[in-house]
């Protein structure tokens, strides 16, 4: 019955020598043991179920706020503004961007104001989605963008088994559409740089260019979007003081593609980077809404240069 003390000499629990405390402890212990022994008073499965659900909810909440360094309410107005760019995407992504299957040509979106007949077609993987919407503010166009399905003719990818059929359908549509004069090709080239993909991807992309130019189309190729490989809004805000971080530009895969005479190239690097170094912020906008897709705000700036430099058909 010694007094319980910690190494510093302070009490860490009630003194068992005190009669009232001993009675209270005994009574509480008896109540707890009685409750646990009587299976009718509780359900072990129920307790396990509720604890499991509770832990799951706590884990989900923790994962949600972990990249933000806490609740958004704790962030400065500047950081909250930067974080809002995770939603800076094309407002017609759900309707005009494909993820699977083989879309009918009737599903290709016609974007742009007025009743003018579109002369521009944007064909690409998801890196064409924001550009297509932004460009439609300057000229009416038709678009067919498909996640992880680049405009590389006869290119087969395991992640998108219908890509090869989709691309053939797009090509047939373009070859038989006399109204389309300009075809803008966009892709996240780095995504197809693996040993098993790169050769067939490059060959397929060059085949697309060949077929289009042979049919008299004006082909415009957008090169690799500067991609830091980390979520840009989260990275910029997950620090004490917001600093416009820089990263190295990588267009290794794109440089393997041979562009033929008559094909126009638009270089993002020319506007978004200085040499081989690219900032995560451009004109006070995060360049990406995630780790590789161009933010809509920056896309709206880029399309002005695309139209000016490459003389798109009105």
Model-derived features: positions:
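Extracellular/periplasmic envelope-modification machinery, especially enzymes
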Residues: 38-314
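A charge-rich, low-complexity, intrinsically flexible signal that marks solvent-exposed coils, linkers
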Residues: 1-35
